Amino acid sequence: FFFLPSLIGGLVSAIK
């Protein structure tokens, strides 16, 4: 998938 990185990145940004 190519949209997973975006979702993961968003979650990581929210966590950080």
UniProtKB/Swiss-Prot annotation:
Its main location: secreted. The modification Lysine amide is found at K16. Keywords: Amidation, Antibiotic, Antimicrobial, Membrane, Secreted, Target cell membrane, Target membrane. The keyword Transport does not apply. It is found in: Secreted; Target cell membrane. It comes from the Eukaryota. GO terms for cellular component: extracellular region; membrane; other organism cell membrane. Expressed by the venom gland. One of its GO terms (biological process) is defense response to Gram-positive bacterium. Probably forms pores in target membranes. Has antibacterial activity against Gram-positive bacteria S.aureus NBRC 13276 (MIC=25-50 uM) and B.subtilis NBRC 3009 (MIC=1.3-2.5 uM) but not against Gram-negative bacterium E.coli NBRC 3972. Belongs to the non-disulfide-bridged peptide (NDBP) superfamily. Short antimicrobial peptide (group 4) family. This is Peptide Im-6.
